[in-house]
Amino acid sequence: MADLKKLAEEIVGLTLLEAQELKTILKDEYGIEPAAGGAVMMAGPADAGAAEEEKTEFDVVLKSPGASKINVIKEVRGITGLGLKEAKDLVEAGGKIKEGCDKAEAEEIKGKLEAAGAEVELA
């Protein structure tokens, strides 16, 4: 049981690039495909009825690359600094492009990606 807990902690601690590499390994070597939608539901706070504070940190989430996948890959490379293959894999898989940015930066990134043809949301 302790080994499983340690494994879970390691998985949760992965960076975005490491998680993308793990996905690729699971797909290529073991034939495990990501679930459709790829969303993981997490339990909300215990006091969901209380007034929420205004959010100060945002995650930019790619929902769909749209028809212009190449333009979206170029923008993702510029935003994240990833290599071509890593950016392509990230765009094809969808998910978080950038985590923990302020509202202005998140809106700017969202605008760039949408201008390139992607469907993006802020979380």
UniProtKB/Swiss-Prot annotation:
GO (cellular component) term, any one: cytosolic large ribosomal subunit
GO BP annotation list: translation
UniProt keyword annotation of Membrane present: no
Keyword presence, rRNA-binding: no
One example GO MF annotation: mRNA binding
Family membership noted in the UniProt record: Belongs to the bacterial ribosomal protein bL12 family.
PANTHER family: 39S RIBOSOMAL PROTEIN L12, LARGE RIBOSOMAL SUBUNIT PROTEIN BL12M
NCBIfam families: L12
Quaternary organization: Homodimer. Part of the ribosomal stalk of the 50S ribosomal subunit. Forms a multimeric L10(L12)X complex, where L10 forms an elongated spine to which 2 to 4 L12 dimers bind in a sequential fashion. Binds GTP-bound translation factors.
Protein name: Large ribosomal subunit protein bL12
Organism: Roseobacter denitrificans (strain ATCC 33942 / OCh 114) (Erythrobacter sp. (strain OCh 114))
Encoding gene per record: rplL
